[in-house]
Amino acid sequence: GKIYEQCELAREFKRHGMDGYHGYSLGDWVCTAKHESNFNTAATNYNRGDQSTDYGILQINSRWWCNDGKTPKAKNACGIECSELLKADITAAVNCAKRIVRDPNGMGAWVAWTKYCKGKDVSQWIKGCKL
């Protein structure tokens, strides 16, 4: 995995076409990544309730989005192995996140976005970054 610097991650998200994707700004994505994983691509968190695991910089869940071979009734809507989401290269995580925000909930799929980023001035997350 890799722990990104804030502006470095903003540049990566921008390079992957996330600025304005489905109406969400770069600040929304950087804010969400900060509160989900502290910018760490290797982050994992197990959810005892449904026995799923959240993976990577955006903490994408194995119940719906990726396959880890151990989550009951998993859907794998992104069609990827969860291990792809832990790589230093965030391409797989970004592509899956794009799939997730196309759902009616949008970024509401991320608890951290709803709690810490929604309705806030998220431009502060990219302030001073050379983008």
Curated annotation (Swiss-Prot):
Q: Catalytic residues?
A: E36, D54
Pfam families given in the database record: Lys (PF00062)
Task: List the EC numbers from the record.
Answer: 3.2.1.17
Indicate where this protein resides in the cell.
Answer: Secreted
Q: Temperature and function: what does the record say?
A: Optimum temperature is 40 degrees Celsius. Activity rapidly decreases within 30 minutes of incubation at 90 degrees Celsius.
Broad EC category: hydrolase
Which positions are tagged coiled coil?
none
Q: What's in the keyword line of the UniProt record?
A: Antimicrobial, Bacteriolytic enzyme, Disulfide bond, Glycosidase, Hydrolase, Secreted
- Which reaction is catalysed here? Hydrolysis of (1->4)-beta-linkages between N-acetylmuramic acid and N-acetyl-D-glucosamine residues in a peptidoglycan and between N-acetyl-D-glucosamine residues in chitodextrins
| Occurrences of domain C-type lysozyme (ranges) | 2-131
Per the record's keyword annotation, is Hydrolase included, yes or no?
yes
Q: Which SMART domains match?
A: LYZ1
The disulfide bonds in this chain are: C7-C129, C31-C117, C66-C82, C78-C96
Its Gene Ontology biological processes?
A: defense response to Gram-negative bacterium; defense response to Gram-positive bacterium; killing of cells of another organism
- What is the relationship between pH and activity here? Optimum pH is 6.0.
Q: Which GO terms describe its cellular component?
A: extracellular region
**Gene Ontology MF annotations:** lysozyme activity
Kindly indicate whether the keyword Hydrolase belongs to this entry: yes
The record makes one more remark, namely: Lysozyme C is capable of both hydrolysis and transglycosylation; it also shows a slight esterase activity. It acts rapidly on both peptide-substituted and unsubstituted peptidoglycan, and slowly on chitin oligosaccharides.
Its annotated function is as follows: Lysozymes have primarily a bacteriolytic function; those in tissues and body fluids are associated with the monocyte-macrophage system and enhance the activity of immunoagents. Has strong bacteriolytic activity against M.luteus and V.cholerae, weak bacteriolytic activity against P.aeruginosa and no activity against A.hydrophila.
Q: How does it assemble?
A: Monomer.
The family assignment reads: Belongs to the glycosyl hydrolase 22 family.
Any idea what this protein is called? Lysozyme C
Q: Name the species this protein comes from.
A: Pelodiscus sinensis
